Amino acid sequence: MFEARLVQGSILKKVLEALKDLINEACWDISSSGVNLQSMDSSHVSLVQLTLRSEGFDTYRCDRNLAMGVNLTSMSKILKCAGNEDIITLRAEDNADTLALVFEAPNQEKVSDYEMKLMDLDVEQLGIPEQEYSCVVKMPSGEFARICRDLSHIGDAVVISCAKDGVKFSASGELGNGNIKLSQTSNVDKEEEAVTIEMNEPVQLTFALRYLNFFTKATPLSSTVTLSMSADVPLVVEYKIADMGHLKYYLAPKIEDEEGS
């Protein structure tokens, strides 16, 4: 049997908000080490990888590995019934075709119990190679979300240019163009407000803003976001989930000759 209890249930609510608009259904791989999810988005352009380590839960039990096919829209609807302060418990029997979700109010005066039907999903796991990146930018997640949102009003794609002194986001469209440059911050009291750049070589890559705006739905999970870039490989947008794991999005760069399309 599988049972996982999360006192800070709002984390699970935020994870589903970050996934549901990008992926309709996905397989949750449950093992003794934790919960993993890996899925291409519905249009097979981007890839999502979620890790929630078992030690991040308040109690965690998994007797044998499970692969649970979940409709994320359905799960999100059920999690909307949980209060932000609620304690959430997930429970499934070893060969169950349902997942139980239990929401307990902190004062223990209210307990809600839901059961969600699971799906049979045929999922292929893609190997994600570990690699070194030419440029790694860490910045406030709210700032990144705002830049993506603002530049979406200008064009469909953003050019991210990374150099030692700063990172530049540029977009152009019928109304003109826009550029936003963030300089590396040297002395910031709060780490979550810093912009740091680790660069081996400069990069300049173009990405579809539509997908970046989907990724930034994960902003409530973390005060910072990390962008890892190299020429000709997918961008990695990573949100750390405190003491639990991470949510990573992968997006291939647009090829220059696609620009006009």
Swiss-Prot record:
Query: Which region is the signal sequence?
Result: none
Where does the source fall among the domains of life?
A: Eukaryota
Q: Which Pfam families match?
A: PCNA_C, PCNA_N
The location annotated for the cross-link Glycyl lysine isopeptide (Lys-Gly) (interchain with G-Cter in ubiquitin) is: 164
Gene Ontology MF, one: DNA polymerase processivity factor activity
Q: How is it modified after translation?
A: Phosphorylated. Phosphorylation at Tyr-211 by EGFR stabilizes chromatin-associated PCNA. Acetylated by CREBBP and p300/EP300; preferentially acetylated by CREBBP on Lys-80, Lys-13 and Lys-14 and on Lys-77 by p300/EP300 upon loading on chromatin in response to UV irradiation. Lysine acetylation disrupts association with chromatin, hence promoting PCNA ubiquitination and proteasomal degradation in response to UV damage in a CREBBP- and EP300-dependent manner. Acetylation disrupts interaction with NUDT15 and promotes degradation.
Listed as disulfide-bonded, the cysteine pairs are 135-162
* Chain positions with N6-acetyllysine modification: 14, 77, 80, 248
Connected disease:
Ataxia-telangiectasia-like disorder 2: A neurodegenerative disorder due to defects in DNA excision repair. ATLD2 is characterized by developmental delay, ataxia, sensorineural hearing loss, short stature, cutaneous and ocular telangiectasia, and photosensitivity.
Q: HAMAP family from the xrefs? A: DNApol_clamp_arch (MF_00317)
Query: What protein name applies here?
Result: Proliferating cell nuclear antigen
